[in-house]
Amino acid sequence: MGVRAQQKEKTRRSLVEAAFSQLSAERSFASLSLREVAREAVIAPTSFYRHFRDVDELGLTMVDESGLMLRQLMRQARQRIAKGGSVIRTSVSTFMEFIGNNPNAFRLLLRERSGTSAAFRAAVAREIQHFIAELADYLELENHMPRAFTEAQAEAMVTIVFSAGAEALDVGVEQRRQLEERLVLQLRMISKGAYYWYRREQEKTAIIPGNVKDE
């Protein structure tokens, strides 16, 4: 990469980081202006267009980066799990670590998931589906269950994790610790339930149809 290309990438990175830094519990991406972001990044507003078509393109880039950061962190967690340790507890700790270190990235995903922009909603939905798919792949490999079961389990887990993450953004250290313990329990219940249901379906296939009452 040449010097000019490196400088351009550095400026683009500065714009993304400047936009993230201006998000907060009280301020959403929709309230940011191009001039504010450019000023925070210490560039002229007109220079913004050398890097992004408009503010929405900047926001979509931020959504993609937020999802990628989270997925990369969870991959690292799975690598740590392979060396020993509780799958669920390690994953929950890693997720809470992500929220603690990148609160605005998670806020962006939460808000734009149900925001007014169809493009942003689609981008967040895509990132969540990537997250679910990677978790389903892992569960399928580790638990040796059919894809339909691991996808359902992964979707349930991600839904609960994102809900807990939303709570974690606005609580103190002790409350977050309690929230983490509750989340570990909930995920273990889902995991046990998924395995029980899978075994139950296996047993049903070994019984003559009509002899089993569906629940």
Swiss-Prot record:
Residues 33-52 bind DNA. SUPFAM superfamilies: Homeodomain-like. Disulfide bonds: none annotated. The keyword Signal does not apply. One of its GO terms (biological process) is negative regulation of fatty acid biosynthetic process. Residues 10-70 form the HTH tetR-type domain. It is found in: Cytoplasm. The keyword Lipid biosynthesis applies. One of its GO terms (molecular function) is DNA-binding transcription factor activity. InterPro entries: DesT_TetR_C (IPR054129), Homeodomain-like_sf (IPR009057), HTH_TetR (IPR001647), HTH_transcr_repressor_FabR (IPR050692), Tscrpt_reg_HTH_FabR (IPR023764). Represses the transcription of fabB, involved in unsaturated fatty acid (UFA) biosynthesis. By controlling UFA production, FabR directly influences the physical properties of the membrane bilayer. Homodimer. This is HTH-type transcriptional repressor FabR. It comes from Escherichia coli (strain K12 / MC4100 / BW2952). The gene is fabR.
